[in-house]
């Protein structure tokens, strides 16, 4: 029997491409990042989609990790994949929970020889194991953040190679969210439900922050200070690794382009990295009369980043879209954007990433369409309830002008076993590393939603956030009634619980920013 999601994904993608929007011309095509960046030609870096043609099996099966396993009778699916067809009314935990297997056959291109290869899954639901040619390379716990594997030493050229993935979305209290699905307010729809990429580049390269595990480091980190209509200070941090056999000397070059592809800023800094080592390089640059990002004018620049050797050869490079803006929460003086009090109503909503029929396995176009419809409805704030959402949704919020509250996975559950807290802390670090360059990020919610946790937990998560984002315009929010709320500069209130808003204005702390998060259940 053929996998039923193939038909429904085709229908949905066609509908998304056929739909028109009021903001953009009919021929407009959204731009989606790949693993956090956009490709540039002639940089030695190539991105391959690994989405097509995976063999799929629902259930446990012995020996499926072995490269010689016979999978010819399995269904053929493409990613994103959500395991199964779901009815339009899919609440009540009727989705499948358990092991599923994916296997992909491919032959590496000869041009990959002498380069580095990283396999990048944007997310795999639950706990997962990844094998390449029968070798177990990765075990991961958690369903909402990237899973990245260095496959360079394990590929065989000129012959069939096999990636095998076992994904298990069964209830497991050892990692967040942790709560059994039958008591949860969302579902653990399973599978490899986001995009998968093979990233090929030279052995001297800009790293991936989610792979490197460097506090406030890895990859590219762009932060701002002293933002005004007259000028803005950019702090540019790039983490470069040298996996070649020789020391590297060269430079990092930054070029900033406006919406019309005019170069408005250029900056370079020298770089030397010994073989087998990595180095964080930092510099600052000032842009005069910048176009500032806001919900009503979501202006995006393109920041090109190149690694060049001493002969000016480009060794690696890509670009990111950045928006120059400042966000400040000033207690009783309210929210300020770009140095001025924000004059418009901050109307928003919670958003879950699932959809009728396909569960969590949305194509990028559907994430973008969701953001478009929400913005067209007059919303300016989206809360990613209750987990980091697809990179395509974050890209859309950058482009369409939606503030985003980024949440760590968690909902009304705590496990006293130390491994649970360690995995929460890891999720917080990795969601910041993934999303820190998005101008749409309004604040972070690094706390477990509506959860009773140990007294020191709240302080720990705020400390981790500030370690990972040690620059201006970084804020954390939590419920006003949450344990440890005194460590947070922003408190979420609810009119009917006596916790804030207009119902107890005399007791409000003037240093705290209060935001009425919900007027009713899940309605902002």
Predicted regions and their residues:
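Accessory beta-strand-rich segments of carbohydrate-active enzymes
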Residues: 32, 36-40, 48, 60, ...
């Amino acid at each position: 029997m053929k996998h039923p999601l193939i038909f429904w994904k085709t229908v949905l993608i066609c509908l998304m491409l056929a739909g028109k929007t009021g903001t953009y011309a009919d021929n407009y095509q959204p731009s989606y990042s790949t693993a956090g960046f956009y490709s540039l030609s002639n940089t030695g870096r190539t991105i391959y989609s690994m989405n097509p043609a995976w063999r799929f099996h629902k259930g446990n099966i012995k020996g499926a990790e072995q490269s010689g396993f016979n999978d010819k009778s399995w269904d053929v699916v493409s990613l994103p994949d959500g395991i199964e067809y779901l009815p339009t009314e899919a609440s009540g935990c009727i989705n499948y929970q358990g092991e599923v297997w994916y296997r992909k056959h491919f032959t590496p291109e000869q041009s990959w020889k002498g380069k580095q290869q990283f396999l990048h899954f944007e997310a795999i639901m639950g706990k997962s194991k990844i094998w390449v040619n029968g070798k177990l390379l990765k075990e991961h716990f958690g369903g909402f953040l990237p899973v990245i594997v260095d496959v360079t030493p394990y590929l065989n050229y000129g012959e069939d190679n096999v990636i095998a993935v076992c994904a298990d979305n069964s209830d497991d209290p050892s990692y967040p969210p942790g709560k059994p699905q039958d008591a949860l307010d969302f579902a653990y729809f399973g599978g490899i439900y986001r995009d998968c990429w093979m990233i090929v580049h030279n052995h001297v390269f800009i790293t991936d922050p989610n792979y490197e595990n460097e506090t406030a480091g890895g990859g590219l980190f762009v932060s701002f200070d002293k933002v005004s209509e007259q000028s803005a200070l950019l702090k540019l941090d790039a983490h470069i690794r040298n996996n070649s056999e020789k020391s590297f000397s060269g430079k990092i070059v930054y070029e900033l382009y406006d919406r019309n592809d005019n170069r408005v800023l250029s900056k370079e800094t020298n770089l030397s990295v010994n073989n087998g080592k990595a180095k964080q390089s930092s510099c600052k640059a000032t842009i005069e009369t910048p176009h500032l990002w806001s919900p009503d004018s979501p202006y995006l620049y393109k920041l090109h980043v190149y690694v060049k050797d001493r002969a000016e050869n480009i060794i690696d490079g890509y670009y990111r879209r950045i928006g120059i803006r400042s966000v400040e929460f000033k207690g009783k003086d309210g929210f300020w954007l770009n140095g001025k009090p924000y004059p418009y109503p901050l109307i928003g909503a919670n958003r879950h990433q699932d959809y009728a029929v396909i569960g969590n396995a949305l194509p990028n176009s559907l994430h973008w369409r969701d953001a478009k419809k929400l913005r067209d409805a007059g919303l300016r704030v989206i809360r990613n309830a209750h987990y980091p959402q697809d990179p395509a949704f974050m890209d859309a919020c950058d482009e369409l002008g939606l503030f985003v509250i980024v949440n760590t996975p968690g909902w009304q559950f705590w496990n006293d076993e130390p491994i649970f807290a360690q995995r929460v802390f890891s999720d917080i670090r990795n969601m910041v590393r993934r999303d820190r360059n998005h101008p749409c990020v309004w604040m972070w919610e690094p706390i477990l939603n509506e959860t009773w946790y140990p007294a020191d937990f709240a302080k720990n998560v705020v400390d981790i956030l500030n370690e990972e984002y040690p620059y201006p315009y970084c804020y954390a929010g939590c419920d006003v009634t949450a344990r440890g709320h005194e460590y947070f500069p922003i408190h979420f209130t609810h009119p009917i619980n006596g916790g804030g808003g207009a119902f107890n204005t005399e007791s409000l702390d003037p240093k705290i920013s209060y935001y009425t998060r919900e007027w009713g259940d899940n309605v902002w």
